[in-house]
A protein has these predicted regions:
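Short glycine-/acidic-enriched loop or helix-start segments at secondary-structure transitions
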Residues: 12-13, 60, 83, 145-147
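Glycine-rich dinucleotide-binding loop and its adjacent helix/turn
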Residues: 25-41, 106, 115, 143-166
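Cysteine-cluster motifs in flexible loop/terminal segments that predominantly coordinate metals
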Residues: 1-40
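A conserved short coil-to-beta-strand element within the FAD-binding core of flavoproteins
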Residues: 116-129, 144
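Glycine-/small-residue-rich beta->alpha transition segments that form the dinucleotide
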Residues: 131-133, 137-146
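Short loop/edge segments at beta-strand edges and connector loops
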Residues: 78, 116-120, 164
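Ferredoxin-like iron-sulfur electron-transfer modules
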Residues: 1-3, 33-51, 56, 119-120
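Beta1-alpha1 glycine-rich phosphate/pyrophosphate-binding loop at the start
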Residues: 50-114
């Protein structure tokens, strides 16, 4: 837990619970479920190219590595983390960088992983890479139209100074 309170903030709106650290939250009903246990694959090891190293790309890589696959991450920026890097730079949100740090620590402990930074790939680059599987985890952005979990409709924000981490 990084203390971001995403889980409890959804309760007030009657929305399903979610978590920045545990993407399998609310899966407790599944037999033999545990958020940290990933079964090894029963088939041969596959190779995966993950394009993007934000929270979703890193979590995908972490789980695939635990399942015994070979993972290569191509990141367009100079560091991993995606938008979390910007969010963690905001006042009071410094601990959010743990979303990235936990996953990077797990990934770096694996001998089946490679990460390439400053690597913006073209379609031919992806095709020539010859991975068994390709996963696009190319990011998300803050909305600037006022729509959010507490406000499902857009509104005019033209007369406001609207700031986002971007």
């Amino acid at each position: 837990c990084i203390g971001c309170n995403i889980c409890v903030s959804m309760d007030g709106y009657g929305l399903p619970i979610r978590c920045t650290q545990n993407p399998t939250i609310s899966e407790e009903w599944r037999r033999k479920w545990h958020p940290e246990i990933v079964s090894k694959t029963k088939k041969t090891q596959d190779s995966f190219l993950i394009i993007g190293s934000g929270p979703s790309g890193l979590e995908c890589a972490r789980v695939l590595l635990k399942a015994g696959h070979k993972v290569t991450i191509a990141e367009a920026e100079k560091e991993a983390g995606g938008r979390i890097v910007k969010e963690a730079s905001l006042p009071g949100l410094g601990e959010w960088i743990r979303v990235r740090d936990y996953r990077m620590n797990e990934i770096n402990q694996s001998s089946n992983s490679e990460i390439y930074y400053s690597s913006r790939l073209s379609a031919s680059d992806i095709k020539n890479f010859e991975a068994d599987n390709i996963i696009f985890a190319t990011g998300s952005y803050w909305r600037r139209d006022g729509v959010g979990s507490s406000n499902p409709h857009s509104c005019s924000l033209d007369h406001f100074n609207l700031y986002t981490p971007d």
